[in-house]
């Protein structure tokens, strides 16, 4: 390519370099690990769902790395997942949104030990604003290592129907409900777990309400205990991209007050 002809020559060289660069990026990106984050409020069944999901991915011949997270240490979730044979790293003492570097370090450690094809990360049940604090920086800073899946948020249907005003019953204080609703707001996929615990009519009512309140989001129903609906969920998060990189508005003072109302008990019982 001749560079003497001012603009056109330089443009041709730049185009060629860009093509070579894109070829290298495509080749490198083909080796990226899929990064799946599964959030949701306390008691929604995240760990059981993740265990089921990991088993199905493992059955596809994929290597799985799991990352657990909670406010305490020596997590029961970690012990349970390790007992099922999965390579599992633990981030105690704070949620992913405040421990981003620890999250990256955990993924690096799993990569060195077992070279996962897929990472599944489970944030603290009271955590929200994960798009701004985790998935966006992962994509922007470590996009050559990770292919980011849509953010799934798992919900308990009975609790969700009470909070959304579909059914009467006890629910959390307004400050805790604020966190719950923010989790739904930022989800790419809302996964109704424990579908076997409610009637088909109630399930359809809940799906309709979620579709109405959160248009554009994928709403799915599963039973982690019975194994129902997991294939559809897995296909979606394997093939789809996150809906948005836009951070939502969060009142962090209200968020902190809501978290302060929640408590954790870590104990080993013999």
What residue ranges belong to the model's regions?
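Canonical P-loop GTPase G-domain recognition
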Residues: 181, 196-253, 257
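Short, structured coil segments at secondary-structure junctions
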Residues: 84, 186, 214-215
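P-loop NTP-binding site
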Residues: 27-44, 48, 239-270
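G-domain G4 guanine-recognition motif of GTPases
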Residues: 123, 154-159, 187-202, 220-229, ...
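Nucleotide-state-sensitive switch-loop elements of NTP-binding domains
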Residues: 29-39, 44, 48-178
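Low-complexity, intrinsically disordered Ser/Thr/Pro- and acidic-rich segments
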Residues: 1-8
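Membrane-proximal helix-turn-helix segments that form the acceptor-binding/catalytic region
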Residues: 178-186
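Short, positively charged and aromatic/hydrophobic N-terminal segments
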Residues: 10, 16-21
């Amino acid at each position: 390519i001749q560079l003497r002809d001012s603009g056109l020559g330089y443009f041709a060289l730049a185009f060629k370099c860009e093509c070579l660069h894109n070829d290298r990026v495509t080749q490198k990106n083909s080796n990226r690990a899929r990064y799946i984050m599964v959030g949701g409020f306390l008691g929604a069944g995240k760990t059981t769902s993740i265990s089921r999901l990991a088993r199905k991915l493992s059955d596809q011949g994929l290597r799985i790395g799991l990352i657990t997270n909670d406010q305490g240490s020596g997590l029961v979730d970690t012990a349970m997942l390790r007992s099922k044979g999965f390579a599992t790293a633990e981030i105690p003492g704070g949620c992913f949104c405040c421990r981003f570097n620890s999250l990256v370090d955990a993924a690096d450690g799993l990569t060195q030990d077992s070279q996962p094809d897929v990472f599944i990360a489970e944030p603290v049940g009271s955590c929200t604003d994960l798009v701004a604090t985790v998935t966006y920086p992962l994509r922007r800073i470590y996009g050559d290592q990770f292919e980011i899946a849509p953010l799934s948020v798992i919900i308990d249907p009975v609790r969700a129907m009470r909070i959304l005003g579909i059914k009467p019953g006890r629910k959390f204080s307004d400050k805790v409900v604020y966190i719950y609703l923010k989790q739904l707001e930022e989800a790419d996929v809302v996964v109704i777990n424990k579908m076997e615990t409610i009637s088909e009519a109630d399930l359809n009512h809940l799906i309709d309400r979620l579709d109405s309140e959160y248009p554009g989001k994928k709403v799915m129903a599963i039973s982690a205990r019975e194994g129902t609906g997991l294939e559809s969920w897995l296909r979606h998060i394997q093939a789809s991209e996150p809906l948005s990189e836009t951070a939502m508005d969060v009142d962090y003072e209200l968020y902190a007050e809501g978290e302060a109302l929640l408590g954790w008990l870590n104990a080993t019982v013999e």
